[in-house]
Amino acid sequence: MDLGHWTLSEGVEITDETFGFVYLIECKTTGKKYIGKKQCKSRIKRKPLKGKKRNRIDSKESDWKTYTSSSNELNELIKKYGKENFEFKILKVCDSKWALAYYEIKEQIDNEVLFKEEYLNGIINCRIGNAPKLEMEKYHKNSK
């Protein structure tokens, strides 16, 4: 599978089922880092078929292969030093929106991005509810 400019961490694999991933971008010149998330798929609402009432929901691939970041500061550094001076690394793949939000926050807190100068993350922002039952089962299975 074509990954664009992204590299995979050891043991990480992107498949057609992947909903999104948590990533680390590091500037090789300055050592500055950024942890974020990106969805690989986006939902599209389509009109109902003739005679039906419910909208159809489809998905399409997002721009993840060329995506750099939502951080303006990081994008300015990429313009200044060039994309080739940055490492774009996928840390974890997720199969749901809930898991993607959870693991982005977990990675940011574990790395103390708000306390360390080398990180460009200026805010940890998330709206996340209780874990769906399926996610809880996966979490407990993987944490043993």
What is each residue range found by the language model?
Residues 1-144:
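Structure-specific nucleic-acid interaction/processing domains
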